[in-house]
């Protein structure tokens, strides 16, 4: 499938409805060719998930999906590519999802995984990027390096691209992003750093790679956080890619930019 075909597939498969309906829709969206072959479910730190690849120091991929959908099944393709590029095992935990399990359930499950694996490298995309940043800020000693792709970092209203890019982002818009965030984090004030990591103390973060695209809703969430992290002395690598939709890396076989950012993540974690 090429880029045009992928964009048609995204338009034809909106992720909407109840949490159960969104989970099924996102899984169809993630795998245009049908359900993938998956490794068996394993458990790390009491959290189920799947390992992709084998080798040395583990990598934990905290998946996106607004804390409502997504999992080790939806993120099989990028996890496999990252495992191949690094020659290392990638564990994608199936942390508890909202609305059934709002915050702090996903944080607690992810923290148990990091504790069990003894300072792994961590990757997170979208809500998983938010999760990675919250853990990196509160428990920096429990990860070695961190890479986040289009993370949610701000509910306080500082971002302008949440509205400006809602018409140019095939995969996300501000209304949907807020709906998902309210389901998972709505009981937290918008200025709580657990809801808005942008407002927290970034000074203790491990070496950090951040990436986003110019036309996605969460561009400013990335740029504003990157600027704050840089000011606090964090070792930072920032990549901004032109003219792509949110979660472009989910289809590395269809987007050269998807594989390229996974190569950048692999280099950062080397």
What are these regions (language model features)?
Residues 1-52, 270:
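A glycine/proline-hinged amphipathic helix-loop "lid/cap" segment
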Residues 13, 44-50, 54-270:
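Alpha/beta-hydrolase superfamily serine-hydrolase fold, recognizing
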């Amino acid at each position: 499938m090429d880029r045009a075909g992928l964009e048609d597939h995204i338009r034809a498969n909106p992720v909407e409805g109840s949490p159960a309906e969104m989970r099924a829709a996102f899984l169809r969206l993630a795998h245009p060719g049908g359900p993938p072959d998956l490794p068996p479910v394993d458990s790390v730190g009491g959290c189920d998930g799947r390992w992709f690849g084998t080798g040395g120091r583990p990598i934990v991929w905290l998946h996106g999906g607004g804390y409502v959908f997504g999992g080790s099944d939806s993120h099989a393709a990028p996890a496999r590519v990252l495992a191949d590029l690094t020659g290392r095992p990638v564990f994608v935990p199936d942390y508890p999802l909202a609305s059934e399990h709002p915050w702090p359930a996903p944080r607690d499950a992810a923290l148990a995984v990091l504790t069990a694996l003894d300072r792994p490298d961590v990757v997170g995309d979208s809500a998983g990027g938010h999760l990675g940043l919250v853990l990196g800020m509160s428990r920096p000693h429990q990860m070695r390096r961190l890479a986040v792709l289009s993370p949610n970092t701000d509910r306080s209203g500082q971002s302008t691209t949440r509205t400006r890019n809602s018409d140019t982002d095939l995969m996300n818009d501000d209304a949907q992003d807020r709906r998902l965030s309210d389901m998972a984090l709505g009981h937290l004030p918008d200025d709580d750093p657990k809801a808005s990591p942008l407002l927290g103390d970034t000074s203790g973060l491990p070496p950090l790679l951040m990436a986003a695209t110019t036309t996605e809703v969460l561009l400013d969430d990335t740029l504003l956080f990157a600027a704050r992290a840089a000011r606090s002395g964090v070792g930072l690598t920032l990549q901004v890619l032109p003219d792509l939709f949110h979660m472009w890396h989910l289809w590395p076989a269809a987007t050269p930019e998807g594989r390229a950012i996974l190569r950048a993540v692999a280099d950062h974690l080397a």
